[in-house]
Curated annotation (Swiss-Prot):
GO terms for molecular function: DNA binding; zinc ion binding. Zn(2+) 1 binds at residues 18, 22, 34, 37. The keyword Zinc-finger applies. Zn(2+) 2 binds at residues 99, 102, 120, 123. The lineage of its organism: Eukaryota, Viridiplantae, Streptophyta, Embryophyta, Tracheophyta. The gene is SAP10. A zinc finger (A20-type) spans 12-46. Induction: By dehydration and salt stress. This is Zinc finger A20 and AN1 domain-containing stress-associated protein 10. It comes from Oryza sativa subsp. japonica. Disulfide bonds: none annotated. May be involved in environmental stress response. A zinc finger (AN1-type) spans 93-139. Keywords: Metal-binding, Stress response, Zinc, Zinc-finger.
Length: 152
């Protein structure tokens, strides 16, 4: 047997070479092409063509540089068209990972306080939340004193 015949016998006898002539075997599912030639033949999406060719400057989207204010038209007014200018959203603060008292990095061992600070194991918040809670309850619930009843 010739070496070419052995390959055909192992592959089922019906394996054909790539129609593009690259030397690999093609399949009926890819129109007689190998996988590499089939991928090259398929049309690429437009957003991938520009980046593959190096023309990213031409296909890049136009970005608005100034996003400091948003203008929204308000058509609810009877007299005329008004505009409302809204401020940009507040900046996002990073997660606090240092002790508020000693500025030592606490990582996962730190514990947050209701005041918004982070503390290490050696320090704690100086604010007395128990006393503040007692004062708030006393302020919102005044003491009601009933007058004494006269005995008959």
């Amino acid at each position: 047997m010739a070496p070419g015949n052995e390959m055909q016998a192992r592959n089922g006898g019906g394996a054909a070479m790539c129609a593009a002539g690259c030397g690999f075997f093609g399949s009926a599912a890819t129109d007689g092409l190998c996988s590499k030639c089939y991928k090259q033949q398929q049309p690429q999406p437009r957003h991938l063509i520009g980046t593959a060719a190096g023309d990213s400057d031409k296909t890049s989207l136009k970005v608005v540089a100034d996003l400091s204010t948003l203008v929204i038209k308000d058509n609810s007014g009877v007299g005329g068209e008004g505009t409302t200018v809204m401020a940009p959203p507040a900046t996002v603060t990073k997660a606090k990972n240092r002790c508020k008292a000693c500025r030592k990095k606490v990582g996962l061992l730190g514990f947050p306080c209701r005041c918004g600070g982070m503390f290490c194991g050696a320090h704690a918040c100086a604010f007395d939340y128990k006393a503040a809670g007692r004062e708030a309850i006393a302020r919102h619930n005044p003491l009601v004193v009933a007058p004494k009843i006269n005995k008959i």
